[in-house]
Amino acid sequence: MICKNTFVDYPTTQVRKERVHTYRTLTSATPSLEFFSNENTNRLSEVQCKLTHFLSSSENSSSVRNTRTHKFKQLLHYIFFSNRSSSVLGKQNVHNSQTLGSVSFCEKHAIDINYSENVNKQLNFESHLDDQTCSKRFYFNEQSGSDRYSLKCDSDTDSSTYFGDSASETCSSASNSLYKQTDLTSLCMFNQNKIQTDWSSIDPMDNDKIVCADFEKNFNILKELLNNTKDNGIDQQIVHKEHISHLEKIWKNINEESSEDPSLLLLRLEFLLTDLQTAIRKYSDTVSTNSVNEAFFDKIKIELQAFGVLV
């Protein structure tokens, strides 16, 4: 069953108008879902319906439920209408997350990563980032004559980190083993101890094991991406050590929260979205989209099962 009316009823008319305008803009700019078949589109709609029901039945205030539901819909909306043209990506500033370290695809070849400099700030996902939030923009720069590209930081310091050819690895591994799809670890050329989670060996009903494995994997990946890259011949840092320390505190706080918290699901879906978008952006004309999509949906299934949502 496809959910036809799942939008949150916003408190003001102005917000509703803005949402409708954004939706119509993206829909008109993307007449066809070039990377998703009708079957996969229907499956994603069903996931949206089930998670919407799950969020709406949680024991939180209506404002918290609406905020979390809206954020998840923004993620799904981006997946639905993810066209690779720069004009569409320029308009798709809909992934404006509350969470620290969130990823936002605002324009072609650019990622915004927001984080708070106030390390003493209470760590939770229900409060908005305050005025002490700073933002850095990272650009993908393809290296001519090379199979790797860099993530360039648009800031006062000219720092960058080099990544491997992860997109092709993602696509090829997806066709062979859905649950062993190469993730962000393949991006870290300087990471000698790659962290791999054997999804096929994890019981889908073992919620604790799934949650712990995913948290440990993603946190270590982030530490490698944010840490000093001297081993790769680069003396500068993308993010200072105090920000890494702040990230550690937040990750510890996440681990101590209940696995039923929808915010954790949203955070993990951001990693999946980043992984998929990396493959599509780098190889938009040559990727085997069917295998990538199948792997992506199966990984979403695992994530949802950890929260008691069966797909």
From Swiss-Prot:
Keywords: Cytoplasm, Nucleus, Sporulation. It is found in: Cytoplasm; Nucleus. Its main location: cytoplasm. The keyword Cytoplasm applies. GO terms for biological process: sporulation resulting in formation of a cellular spore. GO terms for cellular component: cytoplasm; cytosol; nucleus. Has a role in sporulation. This is Meiotically up-regulated gene 146 protein.
